[in-house]
């Protein structure tokens, strides 16, 4: 049924090491409904004690198995849950061979496999559909260039870089989400993730203006003249009938973040909050 397209060998190796309970073999997944997760190191669960169990993707997967009505039930008692649901998780962390995932990286590495899996949504068997798609990407696209241009002050170079990076992100993210929507069909839930600001809880907090810049990159200016990552995510979601998991402001304790030299990743308690945001988005 599926014609799995080749992806980069290094990316394939990342997939192989995902535990079978989280990401089944493709032969097993062919006949079962799927939750398909794409994205960056947040989607992978980096920073969690065990990304395969306490990242937000596996947590959401367990919740969906309990709560998602994925197949019309013959009797009412069978209507609750989706016990057959399988997880295919394509998110990955940065590695020595592969930098952090951006929207173009999702396009090149993850989208080909996602499209192959989504072919099942148009076959004659409704029991093997991709039932839910989540995507978490955008932070790596813009944070580095904007931090480099703006940490010394909010001048012309900073503003120009900010606008250019956000414009590129919007185009790249729209391509990925639009392609997923076209392949999945109009009724498949797609949820895009947002982030929270880790800077108050890591080594960058001591740099004047760094905390404010971290928030600006994510949320943009209050008057909307400079859109942030989350403004882009919300606009793209609205354009393609997707939901948004609103994470910003939820991870408000030091224990929610790895901290120190890691100015990116949540801990288990942080991923608990992210999971709740995705659950709320899917409940809309």
Q: What do these predicted ranges mean?
A:
Residues 2-27:
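Secretory targeting and sorting signals
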Residues 28-40:
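N-terminal segment immediately downstream of the Sec signal-peptide cleavage site
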Residues 31-34, 71-72, 127-133, 184-191, ...:
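Loop/turn elements at helix/coil->beta-strand transitions in domains of secreted/extracellular proteins
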Residues 38-41, 77-82, 90-94, 135-139, ...:
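Active-site-proximal beta-strand/loop segments in catalytic clefts of secreted hydrolases
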Residues 48-158, 162-164:
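Conserved SGNH/GDSL esterase-like catalytic core that processes O-acyl groups on lipids
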Residues 61-69, 119, 138, 174-186, ...:
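Sec-exported extracytoplasmic/periplasmic mature domains
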Residues 111, 173-177, 230:
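Generic structural signal for well-ordered alpha-helices
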Residues 195-284:
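Catalytic His-Asp segment of secreted/periplasmic serine-dependent ester chemistry enzymes
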